[in-house]
Amino acid sequence: MKKRPQRLVFIDETGTTTKMTRLRGRARRGQRLKMKAPFGHWGTQTFIAALRHDGLTAPWVIDCPMNRRIFEVYVETQLAPTLKPGDMVILDNLSSHKSEKAAAILKQRGAWFLFLPPYSPDLNPIEMAFSKLKAHLRKAKARTIEALWQAVGSICDLYSPDECWNYLKDAGYVAD
């Protein structure tokens, strides 16, 4: 696959919350850093997307944790329309991902699943893309569900083809 990285599609999910705030800050020497941080009730969502060599595709935010039924809906409504014959969908080895219905949907499109070994996030370059997503979400300070969804939507457009290509290269999927 190092010769045809344009056929690789990496998917994963990550959690997003309305309490995300910057992890670091600056203050003058001798002064204490003061920054507002949310306290109390917050909303948690699951963000799932696909990373290709030229961009982030099929983004989806749901207001609950991922399970097999929701994963099947994601594959059918969001991911499958973006796939081409010969695409290989690479994902982590979660039990909710091992769905015969989702595999059949991909087979109809001429694509297939390839599961990563357990506990190997370094083999999934979308983890690097999620790091950027979370940094931008912290900066956006979205405190409502609607604001979080809008922030995620605008951040998804920030991934350039060169950046996505470098994610694949850093994970070892592109030959020099």
Residue ranges, per PLM feature:
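Short functional hotspots at interaction and active-site rims
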Residues: 1-176
